[in-house]
Amino acid sequence: VSRRLARETPNAIYVNQYDNLANREAHYRMTGPEILKQMPEIDVFVAGIGTGGTICGVGKYLKENKPSCRVVAVDPVGSIVYDYFKYGKLKTAPKTYKIEGIGEDFIPKNYDLSVIDDMIQV
């Protein structure tokens, strides 16, 4: 819908937060440093994996600046991301899930799963 509205609406833009790497970069440059400043003894960072921007951007920053910090993603049952993370391939077709904002039926360009230590299904 948002792509169509951007095409049809004068002066509108489509941000494409799933594949726009500025999403991940913003969290790397801003959110990650803020978290580490506020919690210098952080042991684990847990976040949902939707667009990938938050967890992958913050995760990269934390791995570079506090390598002992674990990064754990949360993904709903029914999303394809858990299988892709655990097995390196898509094992199941996406199913319906009732959690809004996380979980996907495709792998966005913002995903850098190398910064994620573990993933939990909810």
Task: Report each predicted region and the residues it spans.
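Short beta-strands and strand-loop turn motifs
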Residues: 14-18
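A structural micro-motif
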Residues: 10-12, 69
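PLP-dependent aminotransferase-class I/II
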Residues: 1-9
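Glycine-rich phosphate/pyrophosphate-binding loop at beta-loop-alpha junctions
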Residues: 1, 19-120
